[in-house]
């Protein structure tokens, strides 16, 4: 048990969970912010670290009083109704959104936050839910068939929030201006997703105890960050964007990510596994490509080796699956099979 939680300071601690009742010896790592406090339970540790993680995301407009959401129009599709909304999530600019409501669904039914990718496709944004990409078929028909009320928003600089004809320049300018003003682009992105989850959870069709976050690439990163920051996320599914930050540096992979990915001072306080430990013991499926430069295999395996013992301690090892497939930055049919199985098990089945 000595190496059970390899990034914590060696202490004995008690947890309120029956699965973790008793004391666990834990091992030291260099940075003191990774340590449990004396007498601190794991859930208390998570809450403290969650606050620290939010604190790294810049000056966020927590006191903003949102205007009521505005439904723009409704469209009928095969198997679902699509509502187009404009949401006030941040007080800086309106956020266009898609809300997919299946014709056949439970009452109440699970909710899914679909988070779009980057890939330099600044025009695509939330429409990825409907259109898919060259490496991932669309999810709208799947969500309709599964009975998932699904929300997708345009991220900063994407879709209807692309304000510069040159999308790359627009993203860099937004990042730099926010930095000057004490804000962090990724922090504002995560605030939008957090507030979007508020909207989804508050829908009358949705069971707020069955919420999932899903995405590929940038969407994957935002999905596991959101789950770490917000315990309401019951199921996290990330596709092709989970690896240890230091492994990414060692593999010279930093240029593969947009500038949004980089949070000032993050590595002084957290590594990837420490962020993902804030999801434990909630369900987490991560599928990645062994040939993907964004997910160096050694970094994926490192996270798996650190997270699985935590899930095992809760008796929930089956609720965490971190996989490597023989592919690059793409979703394989075998990946989608796992994604649908996990969606059925943790959202649809309740």
Where are these regions (language model features)?
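N-terminal export signals
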Residues: 2-7, 12-30
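N-terminal cap/lid segment of alpha/beta-hydrolase-fold proteins
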Residues: 65-105
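Cap/lid segment of the alpha/beta-hydrolase catalytic domain
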Residues: 115-191, 247-250
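Gly/Ser-rich "nucleophile elbow"/oxyanion-hole loop immediately N-terminal to the catalytic nucleophile
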Residues: 172-216
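Mobile cap/lid helix-loop segments that gate and shape the active-site cleft of serine hydrolases
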Residues: 179-180, 195, 235-276, 281, ...
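Gly/Ala-rich beta-loop-alpha elbow adjacent to hydrolase catalytic centers
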Residues: 215-219, 223
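Short beta-strand/loop motif that positions the catalytic acidic residue
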Residues: 286-288
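C-terminal catalytic histidine-bearing segment of alpha/beta-hydrolase fold enzymes
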Residues: 305, 310-350
């Amino acid at each position: 048990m000595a190496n059970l939680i390899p990034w914590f300071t060696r202490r004995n601690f008690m947890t309120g969970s029956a699965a973790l009742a008793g004391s666990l010896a834990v091992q030291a790592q260099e940075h003191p912010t990774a340590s449990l406090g004396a007498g601190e339970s794991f859930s208390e540790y998570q809450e403290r670290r969650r606050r620290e993680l939010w604190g790294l995301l810049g000056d966020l407009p927590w006191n903003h009083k949102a205007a009521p959401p505005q439904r723009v129009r409704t469209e009928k599709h095969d198997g679902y109704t699509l509502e187009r909304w404009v949401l006030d999530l941040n007080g800086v600019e309106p956020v266009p959104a898609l809300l997919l409501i299946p014709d056949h669904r439970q009452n109440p039914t699970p909710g899914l936050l679909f988070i779009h990718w980057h890939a330099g496709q600044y025009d695509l944004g939330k429409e990825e839910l409907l259109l898919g990409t060259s490496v991932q078929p669309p999810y709208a028909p799947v969500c309709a068939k599964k009975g998932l009320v699904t929300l997708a928003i345009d991220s900063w600089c994407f879709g209807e929030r692309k304000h510069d004809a040159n999308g790359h320049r627009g993203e860099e300018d937004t990042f730099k201006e926010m930095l000057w003003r004490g804000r962090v682009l990724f922090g504002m992105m995560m605030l939008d997703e957090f507030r979007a989850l508020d909207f989804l959870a508050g829908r009358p069709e949705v069971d707020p105890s069955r919420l999932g976050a899903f995405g590929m690439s940038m969407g994957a990163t935002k999905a596991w960050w959101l789950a770490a920051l917000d315990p309401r996320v019951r199921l996290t599914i990330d596709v092709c964007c989970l690896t240890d930050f230091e492994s990414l540096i060692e593999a010279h992979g930093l240029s593969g990510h947009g500038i949004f990915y980089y949070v000032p001072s993050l590595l002084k306080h957290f590594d990837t596994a420490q962020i993902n430990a804030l999801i434990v013991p909630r369900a987490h499926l991560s599928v990645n490509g062994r040939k993907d430069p964004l997910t160096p295999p050694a970094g994926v395996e490192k996270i798996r080796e650190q997270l699985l013992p935590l899930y095992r301690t809760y008796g929930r090892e089956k609720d965490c699956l971190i996989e490597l497939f023989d592919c690059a930055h793409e979703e394989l049919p075998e990946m989608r099979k796992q994604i649908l199985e996990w969606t059925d098990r943790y959202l649809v089945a309740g």
